[in-house]
């Protein structure tokens, strides 16, 4: 059977072409496009474990890529696909822990407020997915809400709603924008993300160009911003079969002078531990707190002045809240749930061939739309619906360069709760307590 990355010459859609679950369906430099290079040539069954997924993924990639190839244009076998859009996966994971930010504007002490915002920032490593989420189509949008609840009574807090919006603003390269805001607590979050996996021979390196900015408006109209200057990289190494984050970056609040050096440590070949993380929080140049542990279990915080320690984050018991979405029939055609509905249904029925056919149909339609747009205007540039590019930011600015266009009025029409844990593979169990920071 021949399964090639789609070229300019369009091929008919058949059952045999389904194994080419291409993320974009265009020819890519470094991608093997020879006969029998499709997924079905080597993938016959679903791996039972994460290590099994990793081994098969590496074997498939090793046989299909040249060193240095950009993997965003690699045909992705069904075995490695998670039937949920990247926009949905990331935004839902952001949403379920957003309650951590709602208390931050009311914390009077600068250091404790910084730690609370940092605690929310450090929920991002839980966004790791063993399987690849679906690459959003251009103009795809995902929207949801969280109706916050009282931690003690578990009762809904009237008027305490956080609104979430994500949009795919570019397909090549794949760039996604994210925003959420809560008017009651005057908080907002902005992010621009471009994730690019690259095959390096003995490992897969994931370049993570992620810019985030959290904005708080405190009493008296005082505004504070919290942002990262760069981000980590991800690695899947031959024979280790675990996905690791590695690298060091800064998370800062210029208005208060507090900052954190966040260091995801590489595990040595001998000794050490997996997913090791150390964070030094400073006021100016003076270190104040040492946070250490792993980003899959427990982080402990130590006050460097009085040497007292306590739990900062317990990733196993962190409280989460459900996501609320509009019913399927009320969604627009470019909503993530509607775009990938057929793919999700195929996987739910364990019919990966039909899921693949639906995925290919969606991507073929996107390519045809792109051709039509370029035929009408050779200089065509897609204009996002919810995000506006900010040309006033300097080229080296570390903040997201797209501004969210907040709607004039926010409404909650016929929203229904979504079981986020069913959609997000590594969702954290719900618990009724939030680990408290120890001074």
From Swiss-Prot:
One of its GO terms (cellular component) is membrane. Transmembrane segments: none annotated. Gene3D superfamilies: 2.40.160.120, 3.30.70.3490. GO terms for molecular function: sterol binding. Residues 409-419, 429-439 have a biased composition (Polar residues). Residues 1-40, 409-439 are annotated as: Disordered. Belongs to the OSBP family. This is Oxysterol-binding protein 6.
